[in-house]
Amino acid sequence: IKYNHGNAKRINHALKVHNYAKTIAILEKVNEYDLFNLESAAILHDIGIKVCEKKYNSTEGKLQEKEGPAVAREILENLDYKNINRILFLIGHHHTYINVSGLDYQILIEADLLVNFEEENTSKEDIKKVYENIFKTKTGKKFCREIFDISL
């Protein structure tokens, strides 16, 4: 919250992604270690946006993936996090939907998409396409169908 002081939209986005990620992970029975890393990555997943705006005048997802890990590293090291490599990997790949390695990675993608669909007023047709191609977890699929009232 401190990092995005004054920007309620970004703060709320991070909190919503975190809450979806945590809920999906618990229902998918993710172990405590991976859950901790996933929650950390979820709350920080868009942390590179400010740098991207200053450096590129853009908030494009691939640029966030490029710049986010360095910002996150500084924050996590200041908080005495020890094993940060997976968290940084997740932050650096959360807009990459191919070669998804790990349940934590899949859940972060799904949580971010659920929030983005709502925030960007994504059409049901587009949501259905993304659902069919990207969503993999039982819980993420269920949430997507129920939240956006999509039928298959």
Segment roles from a protein language model:
Residues H5-K16, K54-E67:
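Active-site metal-coordination segments of metallo-dependent hydrolases
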Residues L63, E67, R86, G102, ...:
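Residues forming well-ordered secondary-structure scaffolds
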Residues D34, N83-I84:
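Membrane-helix interface segments
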Residues V17-I24, K62-E77:
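An active-site-proximal "capping" alpha-helix that borders the catalytic cofactor pocket
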Residues L35-K54, G68, A72, L88-T96, ...:
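His-Asp-centered metal-binding catalytic motifs of divalent-metal-dependent phosphohydrolases/nucleases
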Residues K29-V30, C52-Y56:
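Short, flexible helix-adjacent loops and helix caps
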Residues Y3-N31, L44, L79, H95-L152:
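Divalent metal-dependent phosphate-bond-processing catalytic cores, especially two-metal-ion Mg2+/Mn2+ enzymes
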